[in-house]
Amino acid sequence: MEINNQKQCIPYNCLSNPEEVLLDGERILPDIDPLEVSLSLLQFLLNNFVPGGGFISGLVDKIWGALRPSEWDLFLAQIERLIDQRIEATVRAKAITELEGLGRNYQIYAEAFKEWESDPDNEAAKSRVIDRFRILDGLIEANIPSFRIIGFEVPLLSVYVQAANLHLALLRDSVIFGERWGLTTKNVNDIYNRQIREIHEYSNHCVDTYNTELERLGFRSIAQWRIYNQFRRELTLTVLDIVALFPNYDSRLYPIQTFSQLTREIVTSPVSEFYYGVINSGNIIGTLTEQQIRRPHLMDFFNSMIMYTSDNRREHYWSGLEMTAYFTGFAGAQVSFPLVGTRGESAPPLTVRSVNDGIYRILSAPFYSAPFLGTIVLGSRGEKFDFALNNISPPPSTIYRHPGTVDSLVSIPPQDNSVPPHRGSSHRLSHVTMRASSPIFHWTHRSATTTNTINPNAIIQIPLVKAFNLHSGATVVRGPGFTGGDILRRTNTGTFADMRVNITGPLSQRYRVRIRYASTTDLQFFTRINGTSVNQGNFQRTMNRGDNLESGNFRTAGFSTPFSFSNAQSTFTLGTQAFSNQEVYIDRIEFVPAEVTFEAESDLERAQKAVNALFTSTNQLGLKTDVTDYQIDQVSNLVECLSDEFCLDEKRELSEKVKHAKRLSDKRNLLQDPNFTSINRQLDRGWRGSTDITIQGGNDVFKENYVTLPGTFDECYPTYLYQKIDESKLKAYTRYELRGYIEDSQDLEVYLIRYNAKHETVNVPGTGSLWPLSVESPIGRCGEPNRCVPHIEWNPDLDCSCRDGEKCAHHSHHFSLDIDVGCTDLNEDLGVWVIFKIKTQDGHARLGNLEFLEEKPLLGEALARVKRAEKKWRDKREQLQFETNIVYKEAKESVDALFVDSHYNRLQADTNITMIHAADKRVHRIREAYLPELSVIPGVNADIFEELEGLIFTAFSLYDARNIIKNGDFNNGLSCWNVKGHVDIQQNDHRSVLVVPEWESEVSQEVRVCPGRGYILRVTAYKEGYGEGCVTIHEIEDNTDELKFSNCIEEEVYPTDTGNDYTAHQGTTGCADACNSRNVGYEDGYEINTTASVNYKPTYEEEMYTDVRRDNHCEYDRGYGNHTPLPAGYVTKELEYFPETDTVWIEIGETEGTFIVDSVELLLMEE
């Protein structure tokens, strides 16, 4: 039975896609194809990435002046059709309307830019271009959320990336030309910082949205795989390829023409899928198709392919192939791939060899043998391979049997339709695999050239997958989506790869190398050329282990030392060292021309300008007020980095001027030891601080010492650093300023205290280095910081002054805080306290170049305000003194009442723990014992407070000494107690109490006593529910007594004055109890319950009294705190006991309900 081949070979896509029709081999498409528009834009960005009117006009011509609303709608429809999701009408209309509005506004901006470009000194033209920039910038910032509406992120993605690209291009214009337009330096720097943030934000959104949808689509069936692969291919062309170029908008990193390359591969569907009906076959699994897609690899180029032929019922088809390829910079068959498919012999093999720029187009003839004919065969029965050749038309081709009608240009259109396809094509064939006998074609973008050519007039970006030799330990892994291709990875020290490069310029030309990388560790990179070492330097960690590879985790860093090539064709090698068991990823290598002479001249001019800007006049008699100590250090770095060869005399002169500036800065600084030579070394001067602060030597940020303040686990014990400015250094009625440089900080609190506290919480996000992403973490020959690489310069416009009383989020790392001084009094010596404090676990800070200096005399309103504040402070001080006299008298009486006499070495007989806490509470009512802002700094009442606190400490010690029962207040959990059954220690009204919840539970302690002596057993407890709670004291033979507690009758509260006077020396040698002593004779009946809920607390809870200052509950925390009175229901009972042996047992239990014990005391009677 004959097959009707004419009907059988109708391509599937001709029937399923009404927008594409093949007539006699020609494609008829809509007016605008989103793929063609995106590829055309991509070609423009790759070849014309130079800012200015030409670039702006190109964007207008390619996108923003060319697309009508109906054509923007095709961008949305493209993805809608792929993922079978319709955008809501309102969302669609809003997106298209806003895209149209952006296009109109961009055209107006383009007109304004061209006007200014033709007359750059015209003030009206400057004003117009600034206005149009700000309008358009605001519109994009306002409208771009409309292109990522939740639920529609995927179908909106291709227009989102167009809006993002427009925005980054606009921001780049303002960064490059903004100051010439009239924008301030601060404004330009703010825009630049925002641009860098949005490069990462836009990139991450596109990649995350793409990956999420790709994972959702899946590829288990062949129908799913076709959609999956088409989505992958088309969004690579319309979204990811454009995203890969976003970093090039960083004009400070790429100030000149930059050439990028896209090394990713895209795949067209197996030829058999274009056959009608086959797509619905359930016999082909999508997973098997995906397995034929190449895994990550070093980039190679198609060299040749041998095609084998088999037949089925006299119909010939392509059944197998063998391929060869070559690496970048080489030619010929360097790599041979194994046979794919079968080596059929129905016809002689056909060899297809690459010509010139490779195969740009394939016309395939699908083949299908139906099941009723026997064996099912899906494949191709004919192919035509067209080669790209710019100077020959029509281009050469190779035909396998006969051409087909399935055109690869339908799936991967040309990038330039103004020329014939062989000249305007966007991709070349890179590899062929097969699923069964159905060929699968892999394609690479033409920007990835077959050689790594270095241009002396441009920045050349070369992905490291274009290497020809991968070293052991290095692997090629799938790119994260925003790199334009796959990347290399190492987890230990070694070489990544060798790359062949071709030099087109003179060999005298010098270059600097940069690396775009991501790393979980600090490390060293090294480079070699033809085996000779060229560069080595330290580079910083960019991410934490386990983090996803996001845009912000990649850094472009370079070596400061330029080099030149000795051969026109050379081998470049990159490796890493000084790390292990971490992850390092390499995206690309960049070769940047180094213009040495120009740099030296520019550096000298910049240094001269910076030095002169330090002084008030040309004779260098005084520093400008706004010149900071940090700025002087940075200017010093500029001078030190000048070339000795080019400008040695000028360098020496400038160095002397900077040293003079530094001496003037030191002279006006009222801080002692501003360079942090020591902390806590001198008791009455210099810096005082917590022991966890570290002083570190200069780094790439600080030229001199700086301090690091870590976080703390308890806000009552903060990390702190402080110093007092003596009254003798201050002038009356003058404003003073504290300022400095913060490398990074979180929750850093800064205080200036005189009459009251000036307070700011400063958060400065750190970059990890002052040096931009374009350089490595610099080191010199001896390991010192190499401050001569390009870095972020100090700019006074970026200074952030915290004077508004609000939390200050600095745009720069400079901070300042001022305070006004009224009348000065050397006797009172009020001075000014300078305090830095961190009281959170996540807090931290690194700061240096601190200054406290006179700012200006107070006049007018400021003078009146400080006089009013001073009077208010003195009135409060008088009131405080009056209150203190009263509170001190009451507290002193309470403390004295605890003791027998003024020797304070014996407690009164009736003194109990509650009385001591009550006295301690009265002592804590004394205000201003310490500064509320930092409780280690003594206040005006520190002397009397510490006097009474010392007596309270003595009282606690005497009380603990006379109670023979260890841990009788359960503040140390169940330590020293034996437990049987389940009991618990709970916090009840800030007290640690023993809870016995079950009648079978018991708690006991063995106690050593002196036989024949008398003891008082005193228990404070509370009974809940029915039954009785019992505390029993007994000896091994007999002599048992007990205290019972019940909730069924009104209990009498026993006084605590039973017994004689108790001394501080009860329990003499031989009668003292050892806590680790256990019950003898009862050890089988009791066991230590290691699973009981034990909460080891400090001896006394730390709480803020309600009647002291409430702005700091840790203000008077000196180890003792509030102990609240006994809650209602607690009863204190006691009994007298006379032991006959040297050991007694205290047992606690109950008969029913719950028994709660606050404390158990066993006190020796006085003889």
Swiss-Prot record:
SUPFAM superfamilies (UniProt xref): delta-Endotoxin (insectocide), middle domain, delta-Endotoxin (insectocide), N-terminal domain, Galactose-binding domain-like
UniProtKB keywords: Sporulation, Toxin, Virulence
Superkingdom of source: Bacteria
Coiled coil: none
Gene Ontology terms for molecular function: signaling receptor binding; toxin activity
Pfam families xref list: Cry1Ac_D5 (PF17997), Cry1Ac_dom-VII (PF21463), Endotoxin_C (PF03944), Endotoxin_C2 (PF18449), Endotoxin_M (PF00555), Endotoxin_N (PF03945)
One biological process term in Gene Ontology: sporulation resulting in formation of a cellular spore
Protein's UniProt keywords contain Glycoprotein: no
CDD domains: delta_endotoxin_C
Summary of the function given for this chain in its UniProt record: Promotes colloidosmotic lysis by binding to the midgut epithelial cells of many lepidopteran larvae.
Protein name as catalogued: Pesticidal crystal protein Cry1Ja
Gene from which the chain derives: cry1Ja
